[in-house]
Amino acid sequence: MGNSFTNVVVFSGFYLPGYKGGGPIKTIKNLFDETGKDINYKLITSDRDLGDKVPYTNIRFNEWNKLGNANVFYIQPGLKGYKQILQLLSCKDYDLIYLNSFFSLRFSFFPLIIAKLLHKKIILGPRGEFSTGALSLKSFKKYLFIRMQPKLNLQN
């Protein structure tokens, strides 16, 4: 594979062992399964499943967990999670950042700002989030995200 991006950090709100996040979990797992032998993936995700109040019990916290063809870091909620993201992205041991969503403050907007400050390349995979139906749900929040992006010069 003639890819110059061999080390990729992926952000997704939910991942295995969770299942409540549905399709995005399967999409990211399939990406890792199909291309993980050629690309070194590091996934940053939540330490709990969608809607759960307690973290997973079968993961190691504050360190990378090998899961299939990727290393996964499960971040904690609140300010501690933002600090963890900042520390992980500051390491700069990656070529590219892949954001699996656009409308997540923790897993898209914040990493996008940090990546811009660090001059890192970014790929956005919004997975249908800009469809008319999707935009009508929680529309005020999405309107703010869309309006803030060009004002912060985050599009390049």
Task: Label each residue range with its predicted role.
Residues Q87-F107, L118-I123:
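Short N-terminal targeting/anchoring amphipathic segment
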Residues L16-P17, L105-R106, I122-F140:
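A short, histidine- and acid-enriched strand-loop-helix "catalytic/donor-clamping" loop
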Residues N3-G21, I25, R127:
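Nucleotide-activated donor-dependent transferases that construct or modify glycoconjugates
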Residues G22-T35, Q149:
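Short amphipathic alpha-helix
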